[in-house]
Amino acid sequence: MKKALFIILMIAIGLSAMAQQKIQLRSTDKSECVSSDMNSLRATFSFSTIEAEDYSSDRGTFSWISLPNTVLGGEVGNPQVPVINELIAVPYGATPRIEVTRYSTTDYSLEDYGIKTLVPRQLPVRKNQNLEDVPFVMNEDAYQTRGLRSEPHAAVSVDGTMRGVQLGKMTIDPVSYDPVSNTIRVFNDIEVMVHFDGADAQTTKKMLMKTYSPAFDAVYSQLFNNKAITDV
């Protein structure tokens, strides 16, 4: 009996290992706002591990990869890749622009690690939806696209205001994917500089002082560059 249980346990462990794969990277996990003021924001991002899991669908079995401190990215139907997505405070009057100042690159053949073709990004599913009623979306053209980017794509935008704070979104793609060869290029040890061109420091401080409330400290703390607010 004990021998049978041991065999079952070993099979279960083996199946789990097959379903979950890891790629060890050369860096440690970091997502840090190094400095932030009315003129600019400097940040660094690095990753220690890529984790992958199998994803079964009516189109076959795909893989799903993730990096620490990232969210799901990619257009619906296109290969799903991890994305850095941070909410930032932007000074009033500023036109933000982002500059990638440093990064390293390493290419990985996913097949070497038992990782299958990356799953297409799917539409969000409501809690009350039946999964069987949700169609599987796959952009065939996107899966015929060859090539890897030479540098990480980065973007920043202004998205509105909250309690006197102008909000922006900083997005960085740390992974480029070639679905034809099933190869990824990981951009690691990324350093970016966000410039706040034309920032109106006086108006920004005035709005913060006018609308600040300790009740919203928990909300402010969610901002990537929250010290830019707490230090005013």
Would you name each region that the model predicts?
Residues 18-232:
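Extracellular pro-sequences of secreted precursors
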Residues 10-18:
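Hydrophobic h-region of N-terminal signal peptides that target proteins for export
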Residues 2-8:
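Sec-dependent signal peptide recognition
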